[in-house]
């Protein structure tokens, strides 16, 4: 603007905004170039590591053909197990299992009174799923990994009457105990347990339109455009699905589906103003750069663990922050263990885990590695010594770390991972004395059997809807439904150089992925997970919000995500997360004390839809799964919420308005809307009432030019910030901003109002169709 030039730039929003967008694009390109240049200095090291990993993989014996690298191997292993189960069920019908019948009868006589419909302690012993799920303790009643140590067997022989089950009388007789012990040793197969017949028959393949919708949502988090749909349907080639998968996985927007996943799993929790419990830096930008640059997952996880860069502007150091936390490195170890090792270590924060094998010493030894110094349990996290001295029942927990005892950095997970810390790792470390770097290597090494398997299982689960191992972040006591398939996928991940896209491609190319979904619940029992079909999945909050904007042709309308745009506060007490262009860029809008004068009303309209569908901006704890239960708020906010009302409005200059003006006929307009919103054409019965609604007045839908008046421009209001939000006018200004946000943008004056409202009703009805929020 200040450089002499012959170009005349009007000082209006329309003149300045394209210039700003061009400047942002130029700066982003420069930033990418700088990052790639710096990253290239490490390329040789990672090439060598991946070559070493492939050599190690080739040296290991395998019961399956690792060179078989196509998706047919997935379908072969799935069908092989279905066929085996069908044979077993036929044999079971011909030869009943008397031991199972006796064991289930014992449970029904002695246990179901409390652990049946009443579910005392959250434990349901009416079926095998309940047996494996456990109760409120989180521990399965039968541990299929260590059957003889199963809590069920321990409780029936306990010498303490307060802990023995059943609690009445003298407990079970010796004969009943022996039956249960033998039954658990066999795997606790239920007498009436059969795999549902539906789970033994593969579902049909999706049609092309439904496949494209599923693949596009899974790969880039958006609905396919009309043009993409039409081109795909018109393509007669046999390999068009494989080519579509390749195109989608190569799309730069592929990163946008994984960023919110890892935000949840890694508990990214940036706070716009004044850090609160477990606030982190905005390491979303580190994740975005790593995923867009297609960094192998072992590389970016290593960079995450190293926690470098500026914690307040997007560096991986932001992961290391945990505000108001008395043991932040212990918290980070808990997150890393759940994310990449399938281990739950939360209990070990204060005491040895009662239902897992990890101890306080394990957790704080790893925390010491991460912190590069000795570590200990802070006083505020200790179980008081008096607790263990209480008379009566023996406590269920132990605290093996003494008060004020410190733990040196060490790796205690050889038994879980199959990998021991040793000097043999030193050649792969630039600084063998750096315990944090050593931890990153131990975590991501191919010899760590858990890392590749956990990552492969997470990829599988995101695309299929159920894991080969459940739950994905707690493998203790669990068994895989398809162990050979899990190992094969893990090996393919290592062989690919830890490229997650390689596993996604294999899964998406399989017939399993391309089948119609089942709405049968995901069984906890691995026996029941046959994968005859993928699970029916609802869009994530991010997919939903982004698809709403994609279908209506509009971008996210939000204020800058900051309460301190003038930057007067120190960087560690305020953030600016910019203007969100994708839903994952949203964040908690809490402003310390919910001060109404600091409201961001337009951002709030987006956030309230996301929250209704399970998103949480404040991630104080990691999580893999969001709430899936139906909530009346979900249809309510799509039907009545301000965001959908604004998006379905044919606003001035919007694609919806232009479609209405350009449509040659009501039928063509309805067809176009169906393709934009539902990725298919309507049936005659579906189209008829919508076409009828648009036919009335269609030829007169455009207003005469002299009747079209320019939209009045709102008065520019002063900006309310942290620096001035306590002045009396601040609340008044914010109330007006909220009113404008709820009102939304003006309708396009070129369209006749009554016809336009009917047209908007048609758009609204498609957005509110139940199939809109479901992935096919």
Q: Can you describe what each PLM-predicted range is?
A:
Residues 412-428, 439-441, 737:
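Long, low-complexity, polar/charged, intrinsically disordered or flexibly structured peripheral segments
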Residues 140-144, 430, 588-589, 625-627:
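Short Gly/Pro-enriched turn/cap motifs at secondary-structure boundaries
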Residues 681-687:
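Extended, well-ordered alpha-helical scaffold/bundle regions in very large, multi-domain proteins
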Residues 2-64, 184-199:
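Pro/Ala/Gly-rich low-complexity, hydrophilic intrinsically disordered segments
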Residues 426-433, 437-455, 461-463:
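Structured secondary-structure scaffolds
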Residues 144-145, 402-404:
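Glycine-centered loop/turn motifs
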Residues 2-3, 47-133, 157-163, 167-169, ...:
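Short, structured secondary-structure elements
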């Amino acid at each position: 603007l200040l450089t002499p030039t012959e170009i005349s730039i009007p000082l209006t929003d329309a003149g300045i905004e394209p210039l700003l967008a061009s400047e942002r694009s130029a700066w982003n390109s420069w930033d990418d170039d700088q990052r790639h240049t710096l990253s290239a200095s490490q390329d040789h090291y990672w090439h060598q590591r991946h070559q070493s990993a492939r050599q190690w993989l080739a040296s290991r014996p395998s019961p399956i053909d690792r060179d078989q690298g196509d998706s047919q191997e997935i379908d072969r292993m799935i069908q092989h197990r279905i066929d085996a189960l069908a044979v077993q069920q036929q044999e079971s019908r011909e030869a009943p299992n008397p031991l199972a019948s006796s064991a289930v009868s014992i449970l029904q006589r002695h246990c179901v009174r409390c652990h049946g419909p009443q579910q005392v302690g959250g434990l349901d012993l009416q079926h095998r799923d309940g047996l494996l799920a456990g109760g409120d303790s989180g521990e399965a009643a039968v541990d299929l990994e260590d059957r003889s140590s199963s809590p069920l067997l321990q409780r029936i022989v306990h010498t303490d009457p307060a802990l023995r089950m059943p609690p009445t009388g003298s407990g079970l007789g010796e004969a009943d105990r022996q039956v249960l012990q033998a039954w658990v040793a066999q795997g606790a197969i239920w007498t009436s347990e059969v795999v549902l017949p539906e789970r033994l028959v593969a579902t049909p393949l999706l049609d092309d339109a439904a496949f494209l919708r599923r693949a596009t949502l899974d790969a880039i988090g958006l609905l396919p455009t009309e043009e993409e749909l039409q081109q795909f349907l018109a393509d007669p080639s046999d390999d068009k699905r494989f080519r579509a998968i390749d195109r989608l996985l190569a799309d730069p927007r592929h990163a946008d589906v994984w960023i919110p996943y890892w935000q949840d799993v890694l508990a990214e929790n940036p706070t716009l103003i004044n850090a609160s419990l477990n606030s982190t830096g905005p390491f979303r930008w580190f994740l975005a750069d790593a995923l867009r640059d297609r960094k192998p997952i072992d590389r970016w996880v290593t960079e995450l663990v190293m926690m470098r860069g500026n914690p307040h502007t997007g560096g991986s150091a932001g992961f290391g922050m945990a505000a108001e936390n008395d043991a932040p490195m212990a918290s980070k170890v808990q997150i890393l263990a759940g994310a990449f090792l399938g281990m739950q270590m939360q209990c070990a924060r204060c005491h040895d885990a009662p239902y897992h094998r990890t101890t306080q010493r394990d957790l704080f030894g790893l925390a010491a590695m991460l912190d590069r110094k000795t570590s200990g349990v802070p006083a505020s996290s200790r179980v008081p010594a008096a607790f263990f001295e209480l008379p009566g029942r023996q406590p269920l927990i132990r605290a093996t770390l003494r008060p004020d005892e410190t733990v040196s950095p060490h790796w205690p997970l050889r038994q879980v991972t199959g990998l021991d810390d040793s000097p043999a790792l030193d050649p792969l470390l630039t600084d063998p004395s750096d315990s944090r770097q050593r931890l990153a290597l131990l975590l991501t090494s191919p010899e760590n059997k858990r890392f590749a398997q956990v990552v492969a299982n997470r990829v599988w689960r995101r695309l299929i809807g159920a894991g080969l191992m459940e739950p994905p972040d707690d493998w203790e006591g669990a068994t895989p439904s398809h162990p050979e398939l899990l190992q094969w996928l893990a090996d393919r991940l290592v062989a690919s150089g830890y490229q997650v896209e390689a596993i996604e491609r294999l899964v998406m190319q399989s017939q399993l992925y391309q089948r119609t979904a089942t709405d049968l619940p995901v069984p906890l029992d691995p026996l029941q997970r046959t994968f005859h079909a993928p699970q029916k999945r609802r869009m994530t909050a991010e997919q939903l919000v982004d698809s709403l904007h994609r279908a209506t042709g509009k971008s996210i309308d939000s204020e800058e995500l900051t309460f301190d745009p003038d930057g007067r506060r120190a960087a560690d007490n305020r953030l600016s997360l910019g203007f969100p262009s994708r839903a994952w860029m949203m964040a908690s809008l809490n402003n310390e004390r919910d001060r109404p004068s600091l409201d961001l009303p337009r951002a709030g309209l987006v956030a309230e839809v996301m929250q209704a569908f399970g998103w949480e901006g404040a991630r104080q704890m990691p999580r893999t799964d969001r709430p899936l239960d139906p909530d009346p708020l979900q249809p309510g906010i799509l039907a009545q919420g301000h965001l959908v009302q604004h998006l379905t409005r044919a606003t001035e200059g919007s694609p919806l308005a232009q479609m209405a003006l350009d449509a040659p006929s009501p039928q063509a307009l309805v067809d176009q809307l169906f393709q934009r919103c539902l990725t298919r054409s309507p049936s005659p019965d579906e189209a008829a009432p919508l076409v009828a609604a648009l036919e009335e007045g269609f030829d007169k839908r455009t207003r005469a030019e002299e009747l079209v008046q320019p939209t009045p421009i709102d008065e520019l209001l002063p900006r309310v910030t942290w620096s001035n939000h306590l002045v009396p006018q601040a609340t008044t200004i914010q109330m007006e901003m909220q009113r404008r946000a709820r009102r939304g943008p003006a309708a396009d004056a070129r369209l006749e109002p009554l016809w336009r409202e009917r047209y908007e009703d048609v758009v609204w009805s498609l957005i509110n169709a139940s199939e809109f929020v479901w992935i096919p």
